[in-house]
């Protein structure tokens, strides 16, 4: 199995993204893909996340990261077949191929910004700046609620992935607003792919309900994963997935 074969088997064709979509991803660093999940799929995922949050309790998210003011879950690859779409959807994988070339899933997590919480400083999802075009990581936000200005929609600085700097290099306080920032709003079921070198951050949830999303994070194949999929893959998960999905996860068997 190789990248081209895996993507072909998962339905990724050369025209899975339009020229305009590729241009927007290159220029702005983000691309909304509407209607990726149906209302039924969104409802089923939210139900499963609520179940997992209740079962895991204080340990929820520990496999990767816990964050004050949020409900987080990690290692979702192993926790329900509903989550397979996040590393198998042709449009999303086509966007990852456009940004990264040869890639793998780094982690699949959920994040719910709780009421009165969720504000983050602007940051990039990488440890250091990279030269424009030499991108190493790319993320996708799977909207499980409508993202609005009131409930903590993600803010980004369009084009900042091409600056070759980090927010702290140019801002006295990355928690402040940036004059060029915009909010990524959209309907539940939308997926927003964004170059992880793009400056971004959550905003304050000023409603009385959590703002829920999945994050499917991808990286170049030579990089370590945020969660070592090979070390965590369960037998039942491995057995239900296809060889192409195994390749996207970079797993070759079970331990």
Residue ranges of each PLM-predicted region?
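A short beta-loop-beta micro-motif enriched in histidine and acidic residues
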Residues: 125-137, 179-180, 186, 209-210
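Non-heme Fe(II)/2-oxoglutarate
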Residues: 2-11, 55, 191, 198, ...
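Non-heme Fe(II)-dependent double-stranded beta-helix
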Residues: 1-28, 34-131, 246-247
């Amino acid at each position: 199995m190789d990248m081209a074969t895996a993507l072909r088997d998962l339905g990724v064709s050369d025209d899975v993204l339009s020229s305009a979509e590729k241009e927007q991803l290159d220029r702005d660093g983000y691309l909304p893909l509407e209607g990726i999940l149906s209302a039924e799929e969104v409802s089923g995922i939210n139900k499963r996340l609520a179940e997992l949050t209740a079962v895991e309790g204080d340990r929820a998210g520990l496999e990767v990261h816990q964050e004050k003011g949020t409900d987080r879950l990690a290692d979702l690859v192993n926790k329900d077949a509903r989550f397979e779409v996040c590393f198998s959807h042709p449009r999303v994988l086509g966007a990852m191929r456009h940004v990264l070339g040869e890639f793998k899933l780094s982690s699949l997590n959920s994040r719910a910004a709780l009421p009165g919480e969720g504000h983050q400083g602007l940051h990039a999802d990488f440890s250091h700046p990279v030269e424009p075009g030499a991108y190493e990581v790319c993320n996708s936000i799977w909207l499980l609620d409508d993202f609005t200005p009131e409930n903590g929609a993600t803010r980004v600085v369009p084009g900042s992935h091409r600056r070759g700097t980090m927010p702290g290099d140019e801002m006295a306080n990355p928690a402040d607003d940036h004059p060029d920032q915009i909010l990524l709003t959209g309907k539940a079921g939308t997926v927003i792919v964004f170059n992880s070198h793009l400056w971004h951050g959550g905003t304050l949830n000023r409603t009385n309900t959590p703002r829920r999303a999945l994050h499917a994070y991808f990286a170049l194949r030579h990089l370590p994963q945020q969660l070592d999929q090979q070390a965590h893959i369960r037998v039942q998960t491995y057995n239900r997935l296809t060889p192409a999905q195994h390749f996207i996860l970079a797993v070759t068997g079970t331990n």
